[in-house]
Amino acid sequence: MADSRPKPANKTPPKSPGEPAKDKAAKRLSLEAEGAGEGAAAAGAELSALEEAFRKFAVHGDARASGREMHGKNWSKLCRDCQVIDGRSVTVTDVDIVFSKIKGKSCRTITFEQFKEALEELAKKRFKDKSAEEAVREVHKLIEGKAPIISGVTKAISSPTVSRLTDTSKFTGSHKERFDPSGRGKGRAGRVDLVDESGYVPGYKHAGTYDQKVQGGK
């Protein structure tokens, strides 16, 4: 026997044709807002001029360095190249003492945060006539945007031995025949005795001038 009771009506109202479009628009706005938030986070993650300089000096001379930690040698170079060391208020000894004080007992490097602490220590000595905050800002200005200075490029040193082996004008024998007066190699002509079939004896300097002499005499 079939159930004659009336079925309850569906209370969920049907969606209008325009509602799917509204849902898509809301979803798009949500995604755009998330993208903007990620962009702001990325912008905030950009390196400051001070940290960028720190990383450049941290990787100097070490291809395997990550740039997140700095050795004492590079710390000293940074202080020299950026003129934190002035030879009066701040010396190389001061720089070494501060580095040993800031780094951990069992560590050989300092992080960027420790680097800033070390600069605060040196700022007190470098700019004694300024307040602590002003002194730190002045030290930061000395370093921001800087990079390691490459110096001590090896120069060629001339010696009698090197000159004898490389100066073609001093070559003798068969070696001399391989180069022209300018020092340029003659190629195959300088290595192989080529047969001269011109009819002139070797060493004759007026080859090919007979016709000119005859015509000039007429």
UniProtKB/Swiss-Prot annotation:
Residues 1-37, 165-192 are annotated as: Disordered. Belongs to the TPPP family. It comes from Bos taurus (Bovine). Homodimer. Binds tubulin; binding is inhibited by GTP. Interacts with MAPK1. Interacts with GAPDH; the interaction is direct. Interacts with LIMK1 (via the PDZ domain); the interaction is direct. Interacts with LIMK2. Interacts with HDAC6; thereby inhibiting the tubulin deacetylase activity of HDAC6. Interacts with aggregated SNCA; may have a pro-aggregatory role in synucleinopathies. Interacts with DYNLL1. Interacts (via C-terminus) with S100A2, S100A6 and S100B; these interactions inhibit TPPP dimerization. The modification Phosphothreonine is found at T12, T91. Most of the protein is composed of disordered regions. Zinc-binding induces structural rearrangement by promoting molten globule state formation. The gene is TPPP. GO terms for biological process: astral microtubule organization; cell division; microtubule bundle formation; microtubule nucleation by microtubule organizing center; microtubule polymerization; myelin assembly; negative regulation of tubulin deacetylation; oligodendrocyte development. Phosphorylation may alter the tubulin polymerization activity. Phosphorylated by LIMK1 on serine residues; phosphorylation may alter the tubulin polymerization activity. Phosphorylation by LIMK2, but not LIMK1, regulates astral microtubule organization at early stage of mitosis. Phosphorylation by ROCK1 at Ser-30, Ser-106 and Ser-158 inhibits interaction with HDAC6, resulting in decreased acetylation of tubulin, increased cell motility and entry into S-phase. Phosphorylation by CDK1 inhibits the microtubule polymerizing activity. One of its GO terms (cellular component) is mitotic spindle. It catalyses: GTP + H2O = GDP + phosphate + H(+). Regulator of microtubule dynamics that plays a key role in myelination by promoting elongation of the myelin sheath. Acts as a microtubule nucleation factor in oligodendrocytes: specifically localizes to the postsynaptic Golgi apparatus region, also named Golgi outpost, and promotes microtubule nucleation, an important step for elongation of the myelin sheath. Required for both uniform polarized growth of distal microtubules as well as directing the branching of proximal processes. Shows magnesium-dependent GTPase activity; the role of the GTPase activity is unclear. The keyword Magnesium applies. Zn(2+) binds at H60, H71, C79, C82. InterPro entries: EF-hand-dom_pair, TPP/p25. This is Tubulin polymerization-promoting protein. The lineage of its organism: Eukaryota, Metazoa, Chordata, Craniata, Vertebrata. Glycans are attached at S151.
